[in-house]
């Protein structure tokens, strides 16, 4: 039994299976999951779990080379700053929400949280550890 890091079986398996430049989306509770894209649904109720702690645990185990958020999220500078702080030294790439939804069609999975903040979605692209 694992004692730290990602304990959710499906999420741990997803992270372990990622190859270079594979994408996953850590999403709020409202992002539509594209047909054919796996959804790992962590949402329990409104706000639980929030996006940021889920992102932190994923980043503990995942090498990330690119991060994308929606321009519309920038109205919530507190959350944007928290996300930017977590993914440093990688910078945030900002696209429209429509572009983010389009990019999510090529993701390996959408990890749905209980986050109740509009546009609180983050696409993580896998890097390499060497």
UniProtKB/Swiss-Prot annotation:
Give the source's domain of life in one word: Bacteria
Supply the alphabetized keyword list: Carbohydrate metabolism, Cytoplasm, Isomerase
Q: What is this protein called?
A: D-ribose pyranase
UniProt gene name: rbsD
Annotated substrate binding sites: 28, 97, 119-121
Q: What class of enzyme is it?
A: isomerase
Please give the SUPFAM superfamilies that the UniProt record associates with this protein: RbsD-like
Q: Does the keyword Iron apply?
A: no
- Pathway info: Carbohydrate metabolism; D-ribose degradation; D-ribose 5-phosphate from beta-D-ribopyranose: step 1/2
One of its GO biological process terms is: D-ribose catabolic process
